[in-house]
From Swiss-Prot:
This is Formate-dependent phosphoribosylglycinamide formyltransferase. Residues 119-308 form the ATP-grasp domain. It comes from the Bacteria. The keyword Ribonucleoprotein does not apply. The gene is purT. Belongs to the PurK/PurT family. One of its GO terms (biological process) is 'de novo' IMP biosynthetic process. N(1)-(5-phospho-beta-D-ribosyl)glycinamide binds at residues 22-23, 82, 286, 355, 362-363. It is an enzyme of class 6 (ligase). Keywords: ATP-binding, Ligase, Magnesium, Metal-binding, Nucleotide-binding, Purine biosynthesis. Disulfide bonds: none annotated. The lineage of its organism: Bacteria, Pseudomonadati, Pseudomonadota, Gammaproteobacteria, Enterobacterales. ATP binds at residues 114, 155, 160-165, 195-198, 203. It comes from Salmonella paratyphi C (strain RKS4594).
Length: 392
């Protein structure tokens, strides 16, 4: 039984978002639809989810004392992390004290860095993964690369959107790759993972929901990555029945091992009928923004429904659909979007995130489109995204 209070009243149900980016914004909107009181927290002011929250706070979320202070002040019923860079030890303490962390503090802690989740998947669950080694010094990094072999990929154990990630083909790149990885970590310099390159036909995100009525799967989401970040995603990604079954088995093992209720973005490599585990996020995934147009319940609606303790029932997928990011490069604290009218149309939508500034390249929006098939949907989404002119 789920009891919900009314926002801004004494019996309000309060949700605190730790991270207030575009994904958190959609979670906030879904909470608002249920009359939930929303508090958005991020490291910078005027973040997207703050625009649709009842209150907001700006803190360093890696500072456990600051995190505990804002949670004690607001007394949320649900704490919903949207990013990895959070003082997860504090979240575990707060959960032990009776607070509800979504999906659970253990899942947040294990997935905040690539080492925790890789060791869980490969060493505890025995799932197929790429070869890997960890390193915490330049010397051990060289040893790790020698063990894995060329080509390989190096990533900070804690980073996102491709930051600090390098593809290494030869020994001449090692010094630069190490330095870049040290600059790209979300919590500063530190430990890295060196991964062998996996042969695959395509990558998918399997959006997996753990809820009171069991584990549910969205249709697989295909995506194209560039510079460590996604450019387009589409649903459904065609794959063999056997590969889909194996993907679902892997995803089920991972989310049940992590625990808690919510939506998880399980990233997998697919080569023929073979499926290899890559990563998992215990929250909505950026490639899953396509579900804003492709499903009756978006990944954000599913996440909220699951962590509130509601049953999912069934997930209806409408047919071929795609998303394409709006990714300008400029410097401005007063961004405007021109020609939006030329981007939208029948079966084509645009979402602008409302980020307060840009300094370089930054994802500021996404175009969504349907089509007769996935290829057409991708073309329509990319065309719509290209028609939006970003100015500063």
């Amino acid at each position: 039984m789920t009891l919900l209070g009314t926002a801004l009243r004494p019996a309000a149900t309060r949700v605190m978002l730790l991270g207030a980016g575009e994904l958190g914004k959609e979670v906030a909107i879904e909470c608002q639809r249920l009359g939930i009181e929303v508090i958005a927290v991020d490291r910078y002011p005027d973040a997207p989810a703050m625009h649709v929250a009842h209150r907001s706070h700006v803190i360093n979320m890696l500072d456990g004392e600051a995190l505990r202070h804002v949670i004690t002040e607001e007394k949320p019923h649900y704490i919903v992390p949207e990013i990895e860079a959070i003082a997860t030890d504090t979240l575990r303490e707060l959960e032990d004290e009776g607070l509800n962390v979504v999906p659970c503090a253990r899942a947040t802690q294990l997935t905040m860095n690539r080492e925790g989740i890789r060791r869980l998947a490969a060493e505890e669950l025995g799932l197929p993964t790429s070869t890997y080694r960890f390193a915490d010094s330049e010397a051990s990094f060289h040893d790790a690369v020698a063990a894995v072999g060329f080509p390989c990929i190096v990533k900070p154990v804690m980073s996102s959107s491709g930051k600090g990630q390098s593809f290494i083909r030869s020994a001449e790149q090692l010094a630069q790759a190490w330095e870049y990885a040290q600059q790209g970590g979300r919590a500063g310099a530190g430990r890295v993972i060196v991964e062998g390159v996996v042969k695959f036909d395509f990558e998918i995100t399997l959006l997996t929901v753990s809820a009171v009525d069991g584990v549910h799967f969205c249709a697989p989401v295909g995506h194209r990555q560039q510079d460590g970040d996604y450019r387009e995603s589409w649903q459904p990604q065609q794959m063999s029945e056997l590969a889909l079954k194996r993907a679902q088995e892997i995803a089920r093992h991972v989310v049940l091992a992590l625990g808690g209720h919510g939506l998880f973005g399980v990233e997998l490599f697919v080569c023929g009928d073979e499926v290899i585990f890559s990563e998992v996020s215990p929250r909505p995934h950026d490639t899953g923004m396509v579900t804003l147009i492709s499903q009756d319940l978006s990944e954000f609606a599913l996440h909220v429904r699951a962590f509130l303790g509601m049953p999912i029932g069934a997930i209806r997928q409408y047919g071929p659909a795609a998303s394409a990011v709006i990714l300008p490069q400029l410097t401005s604290q007063n961004v405007t979007f021109d020609d939006v009218h030329a981007a939208v149309g029948a079966g084509v939508q645009v979402r602008l995130f409302g980020k307060p500034e840009i300094d370089g390249t930054r994802r500021l929006g996404v175009a969504l489109a349907t089509g007769e098939n996935v290829e057409e949907a991708v073309i329509r989404a990319k065309k719509a995204a290209s028609r939006v002119t970003v100015k500063g």
